[in-house]
Amino acid sequence: MIDVNNFEYMKIGLASPDKIRSWSYGEVKKPETINYRTLKPEKDGLFCERIFGPQKDWECHCGKYKRVRYKGVVCDRCGVEVTRAKVRRERMGHIELAAPVSHIWYFKGIPSRMGLVLDMSPRALEEVIYFASYVVTESGDTPLDKKQLLSEKEYRAYRDRYGSTFQAAMGAEAIKKLLQDIDLDKEVDFLKEELKTAQGQRRTRAIKRLEVLEAFRNSGNEPSWMILDVLPVIPPELRPMVQLDGGRFATSDLNDLYRRVINRNNRLKRLLDLGAPSIIVQNEKRMLQEAVDALIDNGRRGRPVTGPGNRPLKSLSHMLKGKQGRFRQNLLGKRVDYSGRSVIVVGPNLKMYQCGLPKEMALELFKPFVMKELVEKGLAHNIKSAKRKIERVQPEVWDVLESVIKEHPVLLNRAPTLHRLGIQAFEPTLVEGRAIRLHPLVCTAYNADFDGDQMAVHVPLSSEAQAEARLLMLAAQNILNPKDGKPVVTPSQDMVLGNYYLTLEREGAIGEGMVFKDANEALLAYQNGYVHLHTRVAVAASAVNNATFTEEQKNMLLLTTVGKLIFNEILPESFPYINEPTNSNLEKETPAKYFVEKGANIKEIIASREEVAPFSKKILGNIIAEVFKRFKITETSRMLDRMKNLGFKYSTKAGITVGVSDILVLGEKDEILHEAQAKVDNVIKQFRRGLITEEERYDRVISIWSNAKDVIQGKLMKSLNKRNPIFMMSDSGARGNASNFTQLAGMRGLMANPSGRIIELPIKSSFREGLTVLEYFISTHGARKGLADTALKTADSGYLTRRLVDVAQDVIVREDDCGTDRGLLIGAIKEGNEVIESLYDRLVGRFARKTVKHPETGEVLVAENQLITEDIAHIVENSGVETVNIRSAFTCNTRHGVCKKCYGRNLATGTDVEVGEAVGIIAAQSIGEPGTQLTMRTFHTGGVAGDDITQGLPRIQEIFEARNPKGQAVISEIDGVIAAINDVKDRQEVVVQGEVEARTYAIPYGARLKVIPGQKISHGKELTEGSIDPKELLKVTDITAVQEYLLREVQKVYRMQGVEIGDKHVEVMVRQMLRKVRVSDAGETDVLPGTLLDIHQFTDANAKVLLQGKQPATARPVLLGITKASLETDSFLSAASFQETTRVLTDAAIKGKRDELLGLKENVIIGKLVPAGTGMNRYRKVDLVKTTQDDMNVENDEVYVEQ
């Protein structure tokens, strides 16, 4: 028996009749299931205990042998082996068919494999198999051809004329005979000859046939095994029959389907024994064929067999297919024990790494641990009494629970889990009540709020699982977002508002200009009401404990506010004292202007200065990033907790809230609207005179009203008091934005109608004034569309993520360096003059491919294969270097993954990526997760007309599926000059003059040109506005151009929406789309022309023949969309669990495919550890060389302990 958990590969193939019989424990002869009186299985029926094993452990059918001591005995009365009942899950039976039947997958799939092997059309096959025509199996010495079809009438005529010199037959028997007669080697050689000359349709047909025949030849499958003589019967526990209350039975549909097969098979046997007329026998054989078809794949041919209530029965194929099928429901998504779920509430007093677990839930989850501990401490005599104690919830149980929970992390998960931060580990603390408490800072990562969200808890059981949870998944470790390397645990809402209020400055506040000897004195003054948080004061710099002050500065006074003194106490000592929200203050030191000599006139100096802006959400984010960069995880999580506490404390103290009086209506509003209305009337006048078209009129009216709204918005923002609560909320980034404010106090502006077209009648009222009935009605369109869109697009985005994960799931960092000599030349991504992604953003965390020198001094800025850090990237960007050649996933040579150097830095940790990191899945999540963000953005504005995300998600799908884009651009196929632009009838033509030839391009009606006569153009560049079709681009240029184009386009969509994604994630995805080539000429290799091969398979095949001095094959790169690419993967398990399950499995079985289990999904399906992270072989197969005892050199601050 193979070791269930450890095998190298998994192979699938066709089963021969002998193989099926060898699996079987006996023949099922009767259609009966169980006896309705005794409720015991009928003998020889579908649940027979003699075939499938006993129903009760260690007990035979008749009851002669009971108990374990008879293990292995076969009862002499009823013939049942005494064993465990669970063998009923694994023992199979079989049905001996009275006539061969065809397997519908191989006959009916597209392309029909049976048809390709026999070179017959599927229609002809169908006629033969379902007894409509005869087929000639032996022509003898008659003018008939082998495989020729004859109708009943023709057959009789030929029979009369030629007697028995030829043979013709019907049904699967005939097909079986033809399949047995095929000589594979002869056919293959014949087809290879034909390929040398054939063209067009004949060529494609020959290639298809060759592929199938080669598959049969190489896999050891016999073509005749596509016809079944024996039908396997799956174990009864996999098609159970259960008694419902009320004595009725519920049974799996498979039992009905099997029963029909057995009934028809038995009837056929009887008819054959009786020697019935052939027409009756044929009809029965056809019905048997249809019954077997329905069992294997119901509904594939003709009308599906239905059960009660006209519901189609679920056949074997349906058991595998779709979200509810075996693959996705049971193999890829299992339900697990030791888990619970509950509503979440906020836990503001928790530490970063803690969560609150309700007591009763914890008791249930940690039950086995508590029981063990109770017994060990002698509080219970045995496990049974311990269990009873817990069930009665006796008081001593709680103390034991406390000790068990210590140091035992739990995982919290919130659905939908869009990226890896959707599951994090926390140390549980017991809380009263029945709600889970969640730390407020991790809400962003989970996208959780406390309006009734629920979360699931899982307990990692083994010590390895606990260690991984603690070291890799603890919330305090996950500070950076894997998609862009920016902190994901930035404070939000109240916390932002509190810190904003704390760092405000106010001219002329109480006690302005006071001087204090240290921070404590200032605090004392604040607590006693002599100064306010916002008061600008001076403090002796020496007393502010800060390592970045120079000796000279320490003898001076520091100008700051009481609030900023409090704020700076949460930062590490060697961090600059932050006095203003600028990068120089953050990264270097406190600006010199805040230090004054002792004895200067403080009040004058302060009065002469402007107020410094307070710290908004963005600045807090930068502070966190900077602290993380310098002090790593431990210090950052401590600071975050302190920042959270400050935020909550001071937003409470500030008492900032919104009242109607805070919304002041703009006085000049009527005037502005009046002007706009006059302009609109003017435009309408011009339209009526016929000076402008309907389109122009519409566009102008829209733009007039948009401008009016912008003017109102600008004036509103200017007229606002900086202390206005709503302004403070939006300025700090806590909640709301300028657009909300404009709608409250200015005007709601233009709205879109249900089809998305902007209605030219604007809503002139604001919410403060109140809307008219018509205005309100117009508003409802947009609001409703927003909600409907959200619901639909969330599903779209989820499906996109699923496809992305599927195509990249086997991309894992597999080695340190692949040794490639190629790189990717990168510069800033621009759209017109606007920089979409700067060179700095693209360089950080990558390895340089070639040495980068300063353009003027020639000084080496980056050496070859050196990591580019933030500082180096700044130097490179400022030196005026335009492009840099870097290592990239695009050019990596590693098989089934990437290497450390080509990938660069792991964005989630800020350190080099480790071997074993599942970068493919991280890339998929990083691209898919913001997809949902984009999706949900339309929802918040309440449908105010603006840029909807229609470019967003659909465009991303278009790019990754490599579809022909909407509004496709015409591209030039040659380098040259635009010779002329001619008008022809109703369209234009562009003539490109190259060195050798000129090309003329017809420009579609309504397309906008991007070129002018005399302009130089290179191949692959657009002649008109629009998106390029990447497949076209690949034909005209090379892989590099396509890779760069796709990367640029994806980044454009996301950056326009304000979402940042690391380039490397897009690179990983695009690489997966371009990993196949199509063989155009096979040379002297074994590959077939026209087949899709992995680049590595192709180079291997060529290397093999080149060594023998033969002719290599040629191929062109192919761009596959992600769905297609997932289905083309080498792993049939992964492809089958993705989509088109039956097609993938049919193909794999005929080719006798081996799944080498390299990706993650395949291993999850068969229940092995995934080969990523600590599951990689290089980490599992570790031998102990010697044991030594040494002191651990770990400094205290490296281990996160908080007393």
From Swiss-Prot:
Cofactor entry: Mg(2+); Zn(2+)
E.C. number(s) listed in UniProt: 2.7.7.6
Binding site for Mg(2+): 449, 451, 453
GO CC terms of this entry: DNA-directed RNA polymerase complex
Cofactor note: Binds 1 Mg(2+) ion per subunit.
Keyword Transcription set for record: yes
Molecular function (Gene Ontology), one example: DNA binding
Enzymatic reactions: RNA(n) + a ribonucleoside 5'-triphosphate = RNA(n+1) + diphosphate
Residues annotated to bind Zn(2+) 2: 818, 892, 899, 902
UniProtKB keywords: DNA-directed RNA polymerase, Magnesium, Metal-binding, Nucleotidyltransferase, Transcription, Transferase, Zinc
Residues the entry annotates as binding Zn(2+) 1: 60, 62, 75, 78
A biological process term (GO) from this entry: DNA-templated transcription
Gene3D superfamilies: 1.10.132.30, 1.10.150.390, 1.10.1790.20, 1.10.40.90, 2.40.40.20, 2.40.50.100, RNA polymerase II, clamp domain, RNA polymerase Rpb1, domain 3
PANTHER family associated with the record: DNA-DIRECTED RNA POLYMERASE, DNA-DIRECTED RNA POLYMERASE SUBUNIT BETA
Subunit annotation: The RNAP catalytic core consists of 2 alpha, 1 beta, 1 beta' and 1 omega subunit. When a sigma factor is associated with the core the holoenzyme is formed, which can initiate transcription.
UniProt similarity note: Belongs to the RNA polymerase beta' chain family.
Summary of the function given for this chain in its UniProt record: DNA-dependent RNA polymerase catalyzes the transcription of DNA into RNA using the four ribonucleoside triphosphates as substrates.
HAMAP family (alphabetical): RNApol_bact_RpoC (MF_01322)
Protein name per its UniProtKB record: DNA-directed RNA polymerase subunit beta'
Species, as recorded: Bacillus thuringiensis (strain Al Hakam)
